[in-house]
């Protein structure tokens, strides 16, 4: 995902690159919430019923700082399944670049810190 985002600093993305960025976002989102769920289960949290529950719990455990942005990410991830127009795709891509990618990086850094303890 970072590679495609870096291209946006040089020029507009072509259709293939936009599609690639959205697909990489979808994969990264799935890995991120499942990583949070695994961490929570390893720490005795039970009864989680999906990504929204997992994100709420991750916020309460301080795995993530911006719970609202993660909830918006869930909504946008669900929207990517039904993107049929360029305007909607452009909106989601803007969020991926400016909001969601930094959130993934923050989660990665937090998990790295926890792994070193």
Residue ranges and their predicted role:
Residues 1-117:
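Solvent-exposed interaction patches of small proteins and small membrane subunits
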